[in-house]
Amino acid sequence: MPISLPRQPHRLERLKAWMDDRGVDSIVVFGPGNVNHLCGYWRYYGGPSALVVDRVGRRTLGVMLDEAEIARELSEADEVIGYGERGFGINLDPIADLVASLAEVGVVRETGKIAVSSELPGADARLGEAIGAETLDAGEILHDLRLIKDEDELHKILASYELCWLAQKAVGDGSQPGAQEIEVFTAALSTAQIAAGQPIEFLADLLSGPNTAKVCCPIHVAGRRAIEQGDPVVADIVIGSSGYWGDSAETHFAGSNPEVEEVRGNLLEILESTRQQLVPGGTGAEVFREMQRRVESTFPGGELPHHGGHALGLTSFEDPHLIPSDERPFEPGMVLAVEPGVYIAGRYGARVENVFLVTDDGAVELRAALGANGRG
């Protein structure tokens, strides 16, 4: 059945509309997330960066001098300027050079009203001092733009999400009696990184046997415990690739464990019922309450001590969240990771997780929405 992807103006058009509404002539954003979001440039171990966007949407990217050539190749910016001098790690205050170079950009130097948002502490204030002008805080609009993903962002999230499932397969294959948790953890990282063909960002809970009741890091971190026959193995794997993130959780088994296998099946049913609640206008608070009720009624003596899920995109943990206090309504274009789990103290835990795209017609698992493969 064809999926109708959410349609909204591109994030640059939404940003330009905000600028017009407030009489802003240009906006300057600092930091890798902001830069990636607005001009598609992200680089492993990249230096401090910033982007200038004017009222017609022209984008000027500022990166370290030696990084300028690759930035011209990879970014969507109309112009790339390199700041500072040649070399790496020589200047201990590169932001000073970044700010100075931005202050010389024509639209910044000559503009009347500038908005700024910064992921680099203090860079916004330093720019204001350099240009001798008052700036408008653009943090709220940048946050709101990130909530709704454009189609190009969905594909970037999908790429990282698929890496998560390749890593999960490695966990499933490696969950054999005698294998150490850290060996399985490392196999997951290696599998995903080789598939990506570049360094990735990798976070993971990897717990086996009775350790699974400890839920997650930092309570239990993958170590030298040897997996035993019949052990459940819980893996929550989060991967960032090219600056966008995917998330997954699965409960694997070293052989057979009928009791926890049944628990996993029940959690998958709760995951599906939760998916059906991810509709425009719904809230994370409503979804969490129902998930918690289902977990506690299905598993007497079990608990759900963590959130029910969260959005993701440029980070692995974004608004909105499936928690009791989040009343932000869901909107088409939001991408949410949903992760029901249950934990029996001293015995075992289990968790499953998929990523969903909210559409006008409800939520669709991200791989299905974009025509990829199914679970696992």
Predicted regions, residues:
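Active-site neighborhoods and metal-handling regions in enzymes and metal-associated proteins
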Residues: 1-376
